[in-house]
Amino acid sequence: MKQINRLMSVFALTAMFVATVSYAADKADVHTTSMFQGPKANTGTAMHTYENGKSLLRVSPDFKVPDTPAPTWRVVDSKGTVYTLDAFKIKGGEKREVTVPAYVKDIAKVQVYCAWAEVLLGESSFPSAVK
């Protein structure tokens, strides 16, 4: 009986370890979108990663922030819900990365949106929604 209990304990610990490692490996991945397509944002891609427990989006070095009054980060989840995040342009430069809030459950698309003109400037998609 003791051997069975010990064997079950070892099995349970092994299963927990494997689950933890696979979860951590998934969070360490970098996911890249397709090329941005749109009237003003049509260069570069967006990348999603986790750093220090935070979900981050970054644009690639070849991405050009559109020269519009208020280019803004937007994400669309797998259900089609749109979330408006931060502006690309900030005083003294450009904001080429953004922290995705925890209430955004997954990301299917990344959009560049002009908040002033209320128009979509460009969009890119992940091959499958990232969490």
Regions found by a protein language model. Give the residues of each.
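An anionic, turn-rich surface loop/hairpin at beta-sheet edges
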Residues: 79-106
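Short amphipathic, basic-aromatic surface patches that mediate peripheral association
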Residues: 57-63
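Short, exposed beta-strand-loop hairpins at the edges of beta-sheets
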Residues: 99-125
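Transition segment at domain starts
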Residues: 23-52, 131
